[in-house]
């Protein structure tokens, strides 16, 4: 019997190895027959701090340049006014029933002022008309290299270095040498036309008030320096040579001064000492990406969904890196259209930043996901200052619409000054801790941050007639847009979810640190808040206020997903509530959905084990809401009724929610129990994943063949209690593990290996 079990185990391992080898041979990425001619369809490259968009403009091959920390950070003078307060908003809404003064203070300036805002760097251009027809354009996400091949035999290769702040290009087999130009943004008006200028013209770069930067060219090098607002400036240094006949190669560096992420050595000085050629830099670059992709892999029988997942995780690795800012609306791909980006390219904390980091945890990219909590820790002081100035209490609430430094920008008041934003952000500290099982992180950052959020909720809340806590005014993004009834006098399910999650997490964290007095206090606070409001339609927006129209934001269901405060594992009554809520959203129709609605809904459908519905919505997202380069464009690009919105502002959160949904279909551990393939579509007969991460610091690999789970391998990084649903017995296996221990589960055995 032991021999038979061992044989089965070995066969499973061999099949898994062969399966993984087959996966590595599959191409994932982008392939076109022409170079894109629109900036939001360009080939994206990036390393978290600098980014490129490769496209063709006016007969030139254009490498748009971006730097994640290049911001105009001018202060908002209105936010220094004495009337700037939560109490002022409460008085205007509750007593005067009039938002006009609130709009004048918080909203109006964002429609006429051009800053604070993210700003573009410029572009490198090569005239390519003489190269003739393009044969192939290809981005291989496994190497993060873009290759363009022309029918004349010329080849261009491009990458943004994964290990430093440089980019590289190389052309081979050129019929004649190409010239190179560095195009700077136009900050002074010269009468030229601008692409797609909106009516108020607030997006014009010329409104920032800068002088055009200084460009210096000597032989085969160019240096460009641009002064922005205050102490912020940017420098680009570009150099090139011809190391062989018909070959042109070069490199460039982008640096800043005056930001949290600026260098001590600027680009020109750095490039004077930089001696790496294209090939040397490429080896280091591809080594980094090899390591990145070794963290986790998937294989699906649906090649469209599989390729999109790899594209999303490529963008994740390109947009979120240690010692760089986190993912903002467009990350390192600021609009290359002569304007400031949509919504200023800011940090939208009512959904966008949060969704952008959903896939990092279970995809086992903790270093990249840690970038978000690193930034939240960095802006903690500014958040506490904002809390004192606007809410007039101690504790921590972060502006919902924020700059690079976490300061308020403004916009629709119910959301730009949302009263529980930090509760959702606290969830990311919680997830980083739970997936990494890092007690040091818990003690030094996670609990101190979450504790201050909990303290803020205690201080800002009031008691109602039933002695239950409530907010003086509440909101539910982005219900009722910017109207008076977007402010609720009864605490919404969105705000309540943020509050209840924060107290639940704070108590759990305090317990883990042995702080029993703290834990007891947070639990007492939790008991003072009401339960979630619901009716026959499911979860409502607020008590006695059901969702009655199609809406893009699923804020009223936050308690279910992503928080897991409500889960179908909690019994039939809760399961019915969740399913009614999802059904009601679908029943109201998709008229006012946008791309991220489909991907968020797919996550929810995976949580209720409805893989077919999840896959269906993910396919709609790809075909209707994504640019050919995979960028999420928010509106229905097919104009086939998937929403009434047909515009195309580019933001990334929908992309990363897509990746998260795929991962929810393959593995779930949010309840503390690992489940593999919980939401596989009916037609999928085989799938596999390698080294996905579960809560508790467990790395999980599993294969699914002929419509059945074949094997599960779990490695315990830190030790601790493992709970896994054994698909062969349908029983929950619970056991204490040691650091490094490997458990293999097959149809006939569970085997340990130290």
Predicted stretch roles:
Residues 81, 349-385, 407, 414, ...:
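Active-site core of glycosidic bond-cleaving carbohydrate-active enzymes
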Residues 152-156, 161-166, 431-441, 445-448, ...:
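A conserved hydrophobic secondary-structure block that centers on an alpha-helix together
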Residues 1-24:
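Bacterial Sec-dependent N-terminal signal peptides
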Residues 23-346, 366-369, 376-385, 514, ...:
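Acidic/polar, glycine-enriched structural segments that form the non-catalytic walls/loops
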Residues 452-509:
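Acidic/histidine-rich catalytic neighborhood
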Residues 154, 162-165, 173-193, 199-200, ...:
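Beta-rich accessory regions
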Residues 330-343, 392-412, 468-492, 539-551, ...:
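Carbohydrate-binding/catalytic loop surfaces
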Residues 110-129, 649-695, 699-700:
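Catalytic cores of secreted or luminal carbohydrate-active enzymes
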């Amino acid at each position: 019997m032991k021999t038979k079990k061992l044989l089965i185990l070995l066969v499973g391992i061999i099949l898994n190895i062969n399966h993984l080898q087959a996966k590595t041979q599959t191409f994932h990425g982008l392939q076109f027959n022409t170079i894109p001619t629109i900036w939001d369809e360009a080939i994206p490259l990036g390393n978290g701090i600098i980014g490129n968009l490769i496209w063709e403009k006016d007969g030139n091959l254009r490498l748009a340049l971006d730097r994640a920390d290049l911001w105009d950070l001018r202060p908002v003078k209105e936010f220094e006014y004495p009337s700037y307060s939560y109490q002022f908003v409460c008085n205007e809404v509750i007593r005067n029933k009039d938002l006009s003064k609130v709009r004048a203070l918080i909203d109006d300036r964002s429609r006429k002022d051009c800053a604070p805002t993210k700003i573009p760097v410029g572009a490198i251009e090569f005239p390519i008309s003489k190269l003739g027809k393009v044969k192939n354009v290809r981005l291989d996400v496994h190497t993060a290299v873009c290759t363009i091949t022309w029918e004349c035999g010329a080849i261009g290769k491009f990458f943004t270095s994964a290990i430093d702040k440089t980019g590289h290009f190389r052309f081979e087999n050129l019929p004649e040498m190409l010239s190179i130009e560095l195009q700077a943004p136009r900050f002074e008006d010269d009468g030229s036309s601008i692409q797609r200028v909106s009516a108020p013209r607030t997006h014009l770069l010329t409104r920032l008030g800068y002088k055009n930067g200084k460009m210096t060219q000597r032989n085969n090098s160019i240096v460009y320096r641009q002064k922005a607002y205050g102490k912020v400036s940017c420098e680009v240094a570009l150099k090139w040579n011809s190391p062989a006949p018909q070959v042109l190669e070069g490199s460039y560096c982008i640096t800043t001064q005056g930001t949290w992420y600026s260098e001590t050595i600027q680009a020109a000085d750095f490039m004077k000492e930089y001696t790496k050629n294209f090939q040397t830099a490429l080896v280091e670059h591809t080594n980094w990406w090899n390591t990145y992709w070794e963290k986790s892999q998937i294989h699906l029988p649906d090649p469209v969904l599989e390729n999109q997942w790899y594209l999303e995780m490529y963008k994740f690795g390109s947009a979120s890196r240690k010692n760089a800012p986190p993912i903002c609306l467009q990350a390192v791909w600021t609009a290359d259209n002569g304007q400031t980006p949509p919504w200023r390219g800011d940090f939208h904390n009512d959904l966008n930043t949060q969704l952008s980091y959903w896939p990092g945890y279970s995809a086992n990219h903790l270093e990249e996901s840690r970038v978000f909590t690193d930034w939240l820790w960095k802006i903690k002081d500014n958040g506490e200052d904002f809390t004192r100035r606007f809410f007039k209490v101690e504790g921590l609430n972060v502006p919902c619409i924020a700059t690079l430094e976490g300061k308020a920008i403004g916009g629709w008041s119910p959301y730009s000054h949302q009263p529980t934003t930090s509760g959702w952000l606290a969830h990311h500290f919680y997830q980083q801790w739970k997936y990494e099982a890092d007690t040091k992180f818990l003690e030094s950052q996670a609990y101190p941050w979450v504790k201050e959020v909990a303290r803020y909720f205690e201080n800002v809340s009031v008691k109602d007639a039933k002695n239950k806590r409530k907010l003086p005014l509440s909101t539910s993004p982005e219900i009722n847009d910017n109207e008076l009834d977007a402010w609720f006098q009864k605490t919404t399910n969105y705000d309540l979810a943020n509050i209840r999650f924060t107290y639940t997490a704070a108590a759990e964290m305090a317990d883990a640190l042995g702080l029993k007095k703290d834990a007891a206090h947070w639990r007492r606070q939790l008991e003072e808040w009401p339960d979630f409001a619901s009716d026959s339609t499911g979860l409502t927006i607020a008590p006695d206020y059901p969702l009655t129209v199609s809406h893009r934001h699923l804020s009223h269901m936050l308690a279910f997903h992503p928080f897991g405060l409500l889960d179908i594992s909690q019994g039939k009554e809760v399961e019915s509530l969740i399913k009614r809520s999802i059904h009601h959203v679908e029943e109201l129709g998709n008229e006012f959905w946008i791309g991220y609605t489909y991907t968020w809904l797919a996550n929810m459908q995976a949580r209720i084990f409805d893989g077919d519905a999840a896959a269906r919505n993910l396919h709609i997202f790809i075909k209707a809401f994504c640019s050919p380069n995979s960028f999420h464009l928010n509106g229905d690009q097919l104009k086939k009724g998937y929403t009434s919105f047909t515009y195309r502002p580019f933001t990334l959160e929908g992309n990363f929610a897509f990746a998260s949904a795929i991962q929810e279909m393959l593995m779930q551990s949010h309840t503390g129990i690992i489940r593999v393939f919980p939401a596989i579509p009916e037609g999928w007969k085989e799938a596999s994943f390698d080294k996905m991460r579960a809560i508790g610091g467990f790395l999980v690999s599993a294969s699914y063949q002929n419509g059945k789970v074949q094997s599960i391998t779990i490695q315990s990084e830190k030790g601790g209690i493992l709970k896994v649903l054994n698909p062969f017995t349908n029983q929950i296996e619970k056991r204490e593990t040691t650091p490094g221990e490997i458990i293999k589960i097959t149809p006939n055995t569970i085997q340990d290996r130290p």
